[in-house]
Regions:
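Conserved pre-motif I regulatory segment
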Residues: 1-34
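Conserved nucleic-acid-binding Ia/Ib motif block in the N-terminal RecA-like helicase ATPase lobe
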Residues: 3, 57-124, 132-135, 245-257, ...
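Conserved interdomain hinge at the start of the Helicase C-terminal
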Residues: 200-246
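A short beta-strand element within the Helicase C-terminal
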Residues: 289-304, 326-330
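Conserved segment of the helicase C-terminal RecA-like domain
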Residues: 307-349
Length: 437
């Protein structure tokens, strides 16, 4: 394993990751990995895969199929953070295929992270050379089947004639692996146990609401949790927006996330939550899978998960790797914990005296230039320090996208930054600077 990459990432491999790397690097067989949500499966396949791909070649060598655009984007970012020298690109619906095709020609990625439908489109139009692809990874294989991508995946496999190795990853066990995947000799790695479904390091609480409408109890619960990061799960998009609006009106700094939002809105919501400028994320189950946000302290079930699998994946957003976390069920009148919740739990008593909502230290700004304008993180820091009057210590996480950039900055400096940078140029290009709310 590349120790330089591990040191850069600041991680130590767990048993599942070590076993996966060993199977990929040393057995020559296809690999199936079953491991709980939050155990680090993205690193498990990427760390060995990057050692088998040729960074000096312009050929596309590996395809990673994922069930949704968020996982495609996050997986590409994980690879970027590893600093392997490999070029990658996420491919997903909701944006023009022609634009993706142009970027494919320019970037010449060695690996793509793609949703099945969009990859099929590019293969059908010969935008991708299928002959050079030797590696196939299907991440969240169980979810791909659950979402009904079986026909799309079958079509993809028929168009990839030279696949030599396959890696399938899942948090749950599928009844069978469909024949179209064409698994050869296979190493099966199962790191699931009954005890690991909900790790012991997650503490389970119930909170009683005397009213069917639980918003007041949710407000008090969040007040009692202070500045800790929390995801509030609901089952309906309208409920997400209603709840988020209620919390905003009561002084909380909130992001919300569901499938009807535009892609940029979804990216902004996740970015504000992950960089700490919005410590509360209100979401449907869309946020329960595929999102790699490492430091979520609390999971709150405003609406109960509809299935045990949904419960496991919601709770898997906290206590990732070896960290601790808490999960809360808000119980309305006549509501009881679902039968599948078998862990020990205790009643959470909300203190009578509560402080005002905690205000995060950071806020997020949008800068209207990105990679396509030859803008780097160093350029962003220089611009904000020179033109925006910031110290480097007042700048947090920076995410440079193709056409724009998100930056976490000190909340107390927001108005000053926007005033000072109005009409200013970055690398000779005039740009827009706005707060992301």
């Amino acid at each position: 394993m590349n120790n330089n990459i591990l040191n850069k990432l600041g991680i130590t491999l767990n048993a599942m990751q070590e076993a996966t790397a060993d199977a990929v690097l040393h057995t020559g067989k296809d690999v199936v990995v079953m491991s709980p949500t939050g155990s680090g499966k993205t690193y498990a396949y990427l760390l060995p895969l990057i050692q088998r791909l040729d960074a000096s070649s312009d050929a596309l060598q590996a395809v990673v199929l994922v069930p949704g655009r968020e996982l495609a984007l996050q997986s590409a970012n994980v690879l970027k953070d590893m600093g392997s020298g490999l070029r990658s690109m996420p491919l997903y619906g909701g944006r023009p295929k022609m634009e993706e095709h142009r970027v494919l020609r320019d970037v010449k990625p060695q690996i793509v992270f793609a949703t099945p439908g969009r990859l099929n489109d590019h293969l059908d139009k010969a935008n991708i050379n299928a002959e050079t692809i030797k590696w196939l990874v299907i991440d969240e294989f169980d979810k791909c089947l659950e979402f009904g991508f079986q026909d799309e995946m079958m079509s993809i496999l028929c168009k990839l004639p030279n696949i030599e190795r396959r890696i399938l990853l899942s948090a749950t066990e599928s009844e069978t692996i469909p024949n179209f995947v064409s698994m050869g000799r296979t190493v099966h790695l199962d790191y699931r146990t009954e005890d690991e479904n909900i790790p012991d390091r997650i503490r389970l609480y119930t909170v009683t609401s005397p009213e069917k409408d639980k918003l007041e109890v949710l407000k008090k619960l969040l007040l009692s949790l202070g500045d800790k990061s929390s995801i509030v799960f609901l089952n309906y998009r309208d409920s997400v927006e209603r709840t988020a609006l209620f919390l905003k009106e009561n002084g909380f700094t909130v992001s919300w996330f569901h499938g009807s939002l535009e892609q940029r809105e979804r990216e902004a919501a996740l970015y504000r939550f992950s960089n700490g400028s919005a410590p509360i994320l209100v979401s449907t189950d869309l946020a329960s899978r595929g999102l790699d946000i490492p430091d979520v302290d609390n999971i709150i079930h405003y609406h109960f998960p509809e299935t045990e699998d949904s419960y496991v994946h919601r709770v898997g957003r906290t206590a990732r790797w070896d960290k601790e976390g808490r999960t809360f069920f808000i119980l309305g009148p006549e509501e009881h914990l679902p039968e599948y919740v078998t862990n020990e739990h205790e009643e959470y008593k909300i203190p009578e005296t509560l402080l005002k909502p905690a205000q995060p230290r950071m806020a997020t700004i949008y800068i209207g230039k990105g990679k396509k304008d030859k803008i780097s993180k160093i350029d962003i820091v220089g611009f904000l320090c020179k033109k925006g009057g910031l110290k480097s210590s007042e700048i947090g996480k920076i995410d440079v996208k193709d056409r724009f950039t998100y930056v976490a900055v000190s909340r107390t400096k927001i108005k000053e930054i926007i005033s000072l940078t109005k009409g200013e140029k970055i690398k000779g290009i005039r740009t827009v600077v706005e707060e992301v709310r």
